Structure formats: C-alpha cells, structure tokens
Amino acid sequence: MGPKAKKSGSKKKKVTKAERLKLLQEEEDRRLKEEEEARLKYEKEEMERLEIQRIEKEKWNRLEAKDLERRNEELEELYLLERCFPEAEKLKQETRMLSQWKHYIQCDGSPDPSIAQEMNTFISLWKEKTNETFEEVIEKSKVVLNLIEKLKFILLETPLCDLQDKNIIQYQESILQLQELLHLKFNVATEILLRQASTLADLDSGNMEKVIKDENVTLYVWANLKKNPRHRSVRFSETQIGFEIPRILATSDIAVRLLHTHYDHVSALHPVSTPSKEHTSSATELVKDDVENVEKAISKEVEEESKQQEKQSHLIQEEKLKVEEEQDDIEVKMGSAEEESEAIKCELEMKVLSETVSAAQLLLVENSSEKPDFFENDMVDLFQFTTLGGVYHLDILELPPQCKPVKGWMIVEILKEGLQKYTYPPETTEDFETENAFPPIEVTLEVHENVIFFENPMVVRWDAEGKHWRTDGISNVSYKPNERLITFSLDTFGPVTLIQDAHINMPYQSWELRPLDVNKVLLTVTTVFTEIQIQIKENLCMLSSVKLKDKKHISILEGTWMTPIPFIIALKEAGLNIFPTRYSHFYVVINNKVPLVEVKAYRQMALLSSTFAFGWSKWNLLCNSTKVVFKVREHLPEECTENPNWALLMFSGDRAQRLKIKEESEAFSEALKEETEFHSTLYHMVRDFASKEAMEKVRSSNCQFVNSVCHMLLSTRLLSYS
C-alpha cells in the first residue's frame, strides 16, 4: 500500500492571543481616531457657529446702537406727523360749536338737547298736549328720536375730559324721559284709535283691523268686536303677520296690538365709560402752570423794560424825541412778546389736546379686568348678545267703550284709568275647569328687512320686574329665512325682541387696508360668515359691500357716508358687528396684544395708509403680546395685485424691523432681513424701501382722514381680534 493522501484544505489557522490583542488595539485606535475627528469637526463647527453668532450679535448691537442714536430724531419727526390727531380733534370741537350756533340761529322750535332747561320745556309742553292721533304721534316721534340720537352721540363723541358727571346724568335722564313719554303717547293714541273700532270695522269679519306703517314704527292692531269663538286666527291683510288666539280670547272684549318699534328703547342704557382722568387732568394742570409761568415771565420782562425807560426819560428830559422813538421800540417788543406768548400758549394747548386724544384712543383698546355681573341661565347677557331689528311690543288690551252717534253727535265714555291691559293668563284660574284653558299664544312676526342674521335668530321676552331680557316662556320657535318670518309660542304677552351673538363675526379670518385714491382707503374684514368692505375718506366712512357665502348682500347702508361713530352704530344695528367692546375678550378667543403697542401701531398705520397697504399675517399669532406682525407694501396703482410684493414688519411700539421670513415660510423667526435696520417708528421703517413720492403723500395726508382711519382701526382691533 502506498502512503495516505493528505486531506484537501488545511485546518483553519488558530488566531493567537497576540494577534487578537493587535486587532483589538487597531479597532480601539480607529475608534479613537474617529472620535478625535468628530471632536475636531464639532469644535470647528462650534467655533464657526460662535463666530457667526458673534458677528450677528455685533451687527445686532451696531444696529441697536444706531437705532438708539437716531431715536430722538425719529420720535421728534413722528411727533410732528402725529399733530394731525389733535388738529382733527380741534376741527371736531369747532364743528360741534358751529352745529350749536346753527341750531341757535335756525329757530325751528326744537330744543338744544345739551341744554337741560330747553329739554325740560319741550317734554313738559308735549305732556300737556292731549288727544293726538297715532299719525300725529308718529310725526312728532321723528323729532323725539332725533333728539335721543343727538344725546347719545353727545355722550359718545364728546371727549371724556369735557364730559362732567352731572352732564352724563343729565343727558341720560333726558333720554329716558323722552323714551318713556314717547311710549306713553303711543299708548294714548292707541286708546283713541280703539274707541273708534266699531266705526272702522271690516265689513266681512265685523272686527276692526288697522295697520299704520312708518320708517321708525309699524302698528298692527285688531279689535275683537264680534267675539266669534271660531275666529281664532288673526292675520293682517297682505301680510303673514298675526296670532293664533285661544277660545277664551276669541270670546272676550279685547284688542290685540303689535307695535313694532324699529329701535330698542326697552334695554337699559349702556353706562358711559369714565376712565381715571388723573393722566389727562395732570397734563392739563401742567400745561396751565406752564402757560402761567410764561405769561408771568413775559409780563415781568416788559414791566422792567418800561420802568427802565421811564427812569431814563426822567433823567434826560431834553432828549424827548429819542425817548419817543424808544417807546415805539418797547411797544414793538411788547407786541412781539404777546405774539410769542400766544404761540407758546397755542403749542401747550395742542400738547394737552394731544394727551387727551391719546388717552381716549387707549381707552378704545383696553380690556376690562372684571367680567360683567353673573347672569342666571334664562337671563340674556347683553355684553354677549345684541338685540336686532327693534322691539315688538305685544299687548292684549281691554277694548275701551266705543263711540256712539247720538243726534248728530259722537258720544264716548272716557275711562279715567286710560288704556288697560287684559291679563292673560289671569292671576287666578280656579274658576276654570280645564287645565289647558290658557294655552300659549302662537305669534308670527316679520324680521326687519335691514337686519342680517348669520344664524337663526333667538327670541327673548322682557321681564319688567327684573329689567332684563329672558329666554324662558317661549317655545316652538321656527324661522323661515327666505320669507324672513319667525313663529313662536308665548306664555304671556309683552315686549319681545330678536337677539344674535354679538361676536358671531369674531375673531376675524383676515383683513386688509388698501389705498384707493388721495386720502381714501378701503378696509376689508373677512370673517367666517361674511366679507365686509368699508371705504374711508376725510372724516367719513361708508359701507362699500357685504358678501355672504360668495354672494353679494344689498344693505340699505351701502353708499351712505357717515362720520365714524354713527357709522359704527349703524353697522351694529344692522347685525354687522366687527367692533369689540372692553368685555369682548371674555366671549372670544383672541390674540391679545398690549394696549399701548396696539394704539401706537394703529396710529402709525393710519399715518401711512394714504400710500401703503397693510394686511393680516399668520405670524402675528406666534409672536408674543408685546409685538405685532403684519404685511405692508407701497401701493402702486399700475402694479399687478395678483402677486403683490409684501414685506413683513414686526413692531413693538418702540422698535420696527423687517423680518427675514416670508408669509409662506415654515417657521417663525425674528431674524432681521439682510441689509435692513431697526427704526423707532413704522414711518422711518417703510421709508427705507419706499419711493420719495410715497413719503411725500404721507406727509401731505389730510388730518381728518388719518384720524378716521385710526378710529376705525382702534374700533375693529384687527391686530388682537384676527
């Protein structure tokens, strides 16, 4: 046998301990090398980051230093531009005085609502007048409603520093007296009308039906003369307005009245906000002291010069001609001193007026720290809801004795107690067998055509004892929006009204303020339900358009120019409320900003509004309460508005900066845009990228226009309620 063949392949070589240690050492060296490289890379990156941060900080500090260096200069220039606000207020004061003078020389017999004696005389004389028909009362009501409106505007438009507490009480008492007397006159006129019910009876039904319509009041009255138990459905001719009355009323000597007043004289008057006047009064006292000091200094200087000249004239009698010439010089000096005194007084008066205006503007954006008094479940909180479309006074009345013809005369028994209400249901029901003898009365009303309800209206009734609106005692409410008819069942008759959430259009989804022409802008506010466009020019505002769910709504207010405060009231009464109150933040989730920052932003936006467009930015939600962010661009008539070139500005009240981010960016950053600087005002911020023509237009803006734009911005509070 030959030798054995060797196995193919050899055994795996065994790794020695030394080799294993060597491998581990190599692995460790590689790991350490990688760690060292990573450390060096991190240190390098960190050094680069710190270097960039240092450079940025140095740049930031340089920009801050530059901003501080020119701050006083910029603020002085802003102060001169903002003189338009006290100038506009001065024009308002002159307009009010001119209005009083025009009323005085007009001599039309109507009283001056601001003079208590004239108002008391007017009320007393009208009280003494008797036997007025409904048509006569309606005609007189136009004068009365105008007086009430004037008194309300006095309370709203007069600066609080010019309103004394006794004046506020006087005006509010006059309003209440006029409201009560007007309603009393309507009741007396209704009684006179019902005395003639038998002569006005319908030939078919035998009952009396009367409808009297006016711009402010509509009367529907039905007298049950036949007492037919089957005649239980009352519908006024050519309308769907009416009642479904129970059998007991159909067989009673009663009349049913629906008096629809297109105004609300039932709800309590809103209290006039009277902030602490310490700031304004202290400023006033300071200015008065300055004026007195200036006058004393000037008069002392003139007196010393006069004494010195008199002494010289006694010593040198022979130089009489020279003395006379010097006396002329003194007279010139005295004249120039008086002119200087007047100029200083005027400047100081403007200063205190500016302080007053600023305090009033700040009041418009201040939030109340305390929520209104607690309301029961069935009570209506009029800080949360608002009445719309006026008040429907529903009354069941006892039919008064009817006129009877006797030998060519009309004889009527006049009850001493006057018009009496029929109690339904009666206070005691023991004499009646069935439980449902007094069911609720079904009522169908027409909603006022000039009012917008974004949701189905709520029906509420007036509680005369508690002096508030309530939701109980009303059932089976149904609303037909196309016909504008609302039907409901009412346990007891009395005043009813329709209410809507006052903040239904808050918060806003977006807004834009855009120039239209010289001293004319368009403010657009977009909400969940509507888009409202308002034009502003000089001291006037106008509703330009209202869009509801992609369709245009025609409002009676469109095309009517009004001053800001009456305009705001008119929009609220039409259901277009985009004007928060100091209590609104309790009912709306808002992006609350510091009041002083808001005021400064609105004032400076108004100054620039004749040339620059402003718009809503989503980043305003992400910055804190001490800063506001919005879009801005110079408005060029020929530019394409599809893709406007907006700049993002952030403003803290003391500093304005242009942000690096855009509206489409993914995250918020306060980083400064390259090659831009800090400024103390919005005016100087936009001047960096605006044309000379634009800035010239800003400087020549009409003071009343700027003031009106500012008032509208303060009233809508776009930066907090968007």
UniProtKB/Swiss-Prot annotation:
<dbReference type="Pfam" id="PF15927">
    <property type="entry name" value="Casc1_N"/>
</dbReference>
<feature type="region of interest" description="Disordered">
    <location>
        <begin position="1"/>
        <end position="20"/>
    </location>
</feature>
<protein>
    <recommendedName>
        <fullName>Dynein axonemal intermediate chain 7</fullName>
    </recommendedName>
</protein>
<keyword id="KW-0963">Cytoplasm</keyword>
<dbReference type="GO" id="GO:0005929">
    <property type="term" value="C:cilium"/>
</dbReference>
<dbReference type="InterPro" id="IPR022110">
    <property type="entry name" value="CASC1_C"/>
</dbReference>
<keyword id="KW-0966">Cell projection</keyword>
<dbReference type="GO" id="GO:0048487">
    <property type="term" value="F:beta-tubulin binding"/>
</dbReference>
<comment type="subunit">
    <text>Part of the multisubunit axonemal dynein complex formed at least of two heavy chains and a number of intermediate and light chains. Associates with tubulin. Interacts with microtubule.</text>
</comment>
<dbReference type="GO" id="GO:0008017">
    <property type="term" value="F:microtubule binding"/>
</dbReference>
<dbReference type="GO" id="GO:0005858">
    <property type="term" value="C:axonemal dynein complex"/>
</dbReference>
<comment type="similarity">
    <text>Belongs to the DNAI7 family.</text>
</comment>
<dbReference type="InterPro" id="IPR023247">
    <property type="entry name" value="IC97/Dnai7-like"/>
</dbReference>
<dbReference type="Pfam" id="PF12366">
    <property type="entry name" value="Casc1_C"/>
</dbReference>
<dbReference type="InterPro" id="IPR031826">
    <property type="entry name" value="IC97/Casc1_N"/>
</dbReference>
<feature type="compositionally biased region" description="Basic residues">
    <location>
        <begin position="1"/>
        <end position="15"/>
    </location>
</feature>
<keyword id="KW-0832">Ubl conjugation</keyword>
<comment type="function">
    <text>Via its association with the multisubunit axonemal dynein complex, is potentially involved in the regulation of cilia function. May act as a cell cycle regulator.</text>
</comment>
